[in-house]
Amino acid sequence: MGHKVHPIGIRLGISADWNSKWYANKAEFAGYLAADLKVRQVLRKKMSQAGISKILIERPSNAACVSMHVARPGVVIGKRGEDIEMLRKQLSDIMGVSVHINVIEVRKPELDAQLVAESVAQQLERRIMFRRAMKRSVSNAIRLGALGIKISVAGRLNGAEIARSEWYREGRVPLQTLRADIGYGFSEAHTNYGVTGVKVLIYHGDIFSFSSVGQEKQDDGSRGDRNADRSSRRSREVR
C-alpha cells in the first residue's frame, strides 16, 4: 500500500512541509499557481548545473521569497553575484512582485533523494551499467549515515527490447510509517533507447515533533508508556 500514494503528499503536515506557502482568494489562486510552476520550470532549466534539490516559494504581502537548496551554490550566485541579480529580475517579471532569493547549500548531496536520482540518471545517460550506478549511490548513502535507501529504475535497461523495472535496497524504508522522515526524488534519463525513470527513497529516521503543525516533542519513555497502556487495554478487552 505504501507505493500507491506520493510519499511526500501523504506526509504533509505530519513529517513533511509544503514547497509553496501563501494564501489567495479564488480570483488570485490560479495566477499564483501558474507563476509558481513557471518559476520552478525556469530555475530547473536555467540552473540545471547547480544541482537543485528543492525550491521553496513564500509570498508575504507584496513580495516573494524563493529559497533554493542546491549542491553547488557558486553556479547560482555567479561571479560577484551578477548571475543571481539577473535571475532575481527575471523572477520578478514572472511573479509581478519584488523577489528575494535565498541560496542554501546542500552539505551532503549523497543523502538528498532528488540529487541522488539526478546523479543516477546522468550516469545512465553516460552509458554506465544501471546496477553499478544504483549500488554506488546506495553504498555512498549508507556510508554517510542514511538508515535506509531504495533506488528503482524503469525502462529499456541496457537497451533491452522489452522495458522492465529493477530496484535495489539497503536498510529500512518504512513507507507506511507517517512519522518517518523519508526523502523522495525522481528524475529521467534520456538515452538512445528511450526514457528511463529513476526513483529514490531515503530514510533518515523518525520525526516526533513537527513545528509547522505545533506537535509536541515526545521522548522514548512517553512512547513506551503509551504502548504499554494500549497493550494493557487490549488484554482487558480480550478477557
Curated annotation (Swiss-Prot):
Binds the lower part of the 30S subunit head. Binds mRNA in the 70S ribosome, positioning it for translation. HAMAP family: Ribosomal_uS3_B (MF_01309_B). Belongs to the universal ribosomal protein uS3 family. One of its GO terms (cellular component) is cytosolic small ribosomal subunit. It comes from the Bacteria. Part of the 30S ribosomal subunit. Forms a tight complex with proteins S10 and S14. Residues 39-107 form the KH type-2 domain. Pfam families: KH_2, Ribosomal_S3_C. One of its GO terms (molecular function) is rRNA binding. It comes from Xylella fastidiosa (strain M12). InterPro entries: KH_dom, KH_dom-like_a/b, KH_dom_type_2, KH_sf_prok-type, Ribosomal_S3_C_sf, Ribosomal_uS3_bac-typ, Ribosomal_uS3_C. SMART domains: KH. This is Small ribosomal subunit protein uS3. Keywords: Ribonucleoprotein, Ribosomal protein, RNA-binding, rRNA-binding. Residues 216-239 have a biased composition (Basic and acidic residues). GO terms for biological process: translation. Gene3D superfamilies: 3.30.300.20, Ribosomal protein S3, C-terminal domain.
